[in-house]
């Protein structure tokens, strides 16, 4: 599943081609995504795209009439293409621009979404209760400590909770906890402020580095140009269960935590 870095890489790739362009058509070939695609043509045709933003793992395409909320789901991608590019299987939506380009949404597994919001996006049900962005000052050790106070849940589950901080999915939660030396099953409310300070710094550094590397390509992710990301080459624990730790040489352990694969070093990461 594309996580925050992959969605941000997509945003950076499509934004220069969309901003200040006028929409001349919207072609929906398959409206049966995670949620049915609403009738958008009347709202969006003729509108000029003002900006392309990201909130958590959602892309927000703003016009004066409202905002398209796009989620890539498990396998979705957005690409900028010439308008006459042949349609392939799983090409579900084309946003057609006046400059002869299209924004094409491809999603083999159809867990993605393309919705419409005329409210301030902060009031949309999908967005209104989200926590702070991890790469902003709003995500800091004081905020995290307050959010974790009294919690008995495993720290990894809390780190992946979008009400606490957005966008830290399974890949980057594994990597950040390894970098911070914190066991993924450590009781969140008992982690001291010094270790939380390190964890916040590692989350920020790892996400920023992943964005710089173009995201992580494991199976499906490609950027707006159809190219893979390269952060997978730098993963220390995710997907490496049973292999040797890059720091101490111990074999990495693999467990299921919150129904997600969790990999850690029992020597380097402590409770």
Curated annotation (Swiss-Prot):
Q: Which GO terms describe its molecular function?
A: 8-oxo-7,8-dihydroguanine DNA N-glycosylase activity; class I DNA-(apurinic or apyrimidinic site) endonuclease activity; damaged DNA binding; zinc ion binding
Q: How is the cofactor bound?
A: Binds 1 zinc ion per subunit.
Signal peptide interval: none
Indicate which residues the UniProt annotation says bind DNA.
Answer: 90, 109, 151
The name of this protein is Formamidopyrimidine-DNA glycosylase
**What Pfam families does the annotation carry?**
Fapy_DNA_glyco, H2TH, zf-FPG_IleRS
Subunit-structure text: Monomer.
The record describes the protein's role as: Involved in base excision repair of DNA damaged by oxidation or by mutagenic agents. Acts as a DNA glycosylase that recognizes and removes damaged bases. Has a preference for oxidized purines, such as 7,8-dihydro-8-oxoguanine (8-oxoG). Has AP (apurinic/apyrimidinic) lyase activity and introduces nicks in the DNA strand. Cleaves the DNA backbone by beta-delta elimination to generate a single-strand break at the site of the removed base with both 3'- and 5'-phosphates.
Provide the active-site residues from the annotation. Answer: 2 (schiff-base intermediate with dna), 3 (proton donor), 57 (proton donor), 260 (proton donor)
CDD domains listed in its UniProt record: EcFpg-like_N
Which BP terms from GO are recorded?
Answer: base-excision repair
* Presence of the UniProt keyword Zinc in the record: yes
For this UniProt record, give its keywords in alphabetical order, as a comma-separated list. Answer: DNA damage, DNA repair, DNA-binding, Glycosidase, Hydrolase, Lyase, Metal-binding, Multifunctional enzyme, Zinc, Zinc-finger
**Obligatory cofactor(s):** Zn(2+)
Q: What EC numbers are recorded for this enzyme?
A: 3.2.2.23, 4.2.99.18
- Is Metal-binding among this UniProt entry's keywords? yes
């Amino acid at each position: 599943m594309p996580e925050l870095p992959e969605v941000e890489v997509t945003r950076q790739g499509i934004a220069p081609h969309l901003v200040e362009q006028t929409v001349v058509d919207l072609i929906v070939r398959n409206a049966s995504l995670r949620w049915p695609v609403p009738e958008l043509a009347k709202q969006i045709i003729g509108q000029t795209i003002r900006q392309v933003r990201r909130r958590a793992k959602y892309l927000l395409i703003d016009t004066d009439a409202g905002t398209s909320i796009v989620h890539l789901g498990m396998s979705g991608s957005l690409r900028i293409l010439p308008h006459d590019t042949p349609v392939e299987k799983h090409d579900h939506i084309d946003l057609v621009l006046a400059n002869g380009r299209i924004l094409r949404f491809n999603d083999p597994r159809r867990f993605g979404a393309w919705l419409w919001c005329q409210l301030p996006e902060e009031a949309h049900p999908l967005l209104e209760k989200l926590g702070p962005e991890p790469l902003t000052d709003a995500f800091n050790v004081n905020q995290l400590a307050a959010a974790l106070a009294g919690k008995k849940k495993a720290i990894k589950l809390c780190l992946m909770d979008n009400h606490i901080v957005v966008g830290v999915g399974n890949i980057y939660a594994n990597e950040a906890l390894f970098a911070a030396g914190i066991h993924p099953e450590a009781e969140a409310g008992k982690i001291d402020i010094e270790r939380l300070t390190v964890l916040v710094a590692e989350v920020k550094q790892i996400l920023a580095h992943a964005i710089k590397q173009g995201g992580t390509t494991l199976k499906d992710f490609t950027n707006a140009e159809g190219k893979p990301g390269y952060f997978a080459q730098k993963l220390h624990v995710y997907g490496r269960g049973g292999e040797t730790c890059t720091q101490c040489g111990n074999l990495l352990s693999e467990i299921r935590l919150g129904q997600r694969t969790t990999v850690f070093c029992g020597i380097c990461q402590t409770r």
